[in-house]
């Protein structure tokens, strides 16, 4: 499955992210982490998906996320993982909807990973082979970035 996304590594491009997502009532979110630090934050609206590289954006990216998410709800899968890291950066979303918890409450399946939920409810096969790849390396490959964007696309 191909995923269209914008990879954001410089502060100048954050204004485009803001313009695209500012009117959205909620934002689809996922993260990729390396050594207890957020490397990527994937953000999606109705149309666009953005991958913010916090290793490149640094404090500017963190401040941007604090401001954007403080007034937005987020939707994601297994958000307790993402929230642990977001909170450690002082990023506190306005509201949270976790599709893993929703799946558990519905009780239609006994497995609740994104891979299992996507297959059960959407009939989509997700390859999670890159989940444990090296997110801390200096340059991420196209396959890693596509993998990162895919979770947001599926949850959306």
Q: Across the structure, where does each feature detected by a protein language model lie?
A:
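A polyampholytic, Gly/Pro-enriched intrinsically disordered region
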Residues: 114-127
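Acidic, Mg2+-coordinating catalytic module of metal-dependent nucleases/exonucleases
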Residues: 126-156
């Amino acid at each position: 499955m191909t995923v269209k996304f914008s990879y954001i590594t410089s502060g100048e491009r954050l204004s485009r992210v803001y313009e695209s997502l500012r009117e959205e009532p909620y934002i689809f979110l996922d993260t990729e982490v390396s050594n207890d630090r957020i490397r990527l934050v994937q953000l999606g609206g109705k149309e666009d998906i953005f991958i913010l590289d916090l290793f490149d954006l640094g404090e500017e990216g963190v401040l941007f996320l604090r401001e954007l998410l403080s007034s937005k709800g987020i939707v994601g899968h297994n958000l307790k993982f993402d929230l642990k890291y977001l909170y450690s950066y002082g990023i506190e979303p306005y509201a949270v909807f976790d599709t893993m918890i929703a799946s558990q409450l519905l009780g239609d399946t006994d497995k609740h990973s994104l891979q299992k939920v996507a297959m059960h409810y959407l009939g989509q096969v997700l390859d999670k082979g890159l989940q444990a790849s090296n997110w801390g390396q200096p340059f991420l490959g196209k396959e890693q970035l596509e993998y990162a964007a895919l979770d947001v696309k599926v949850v959306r």
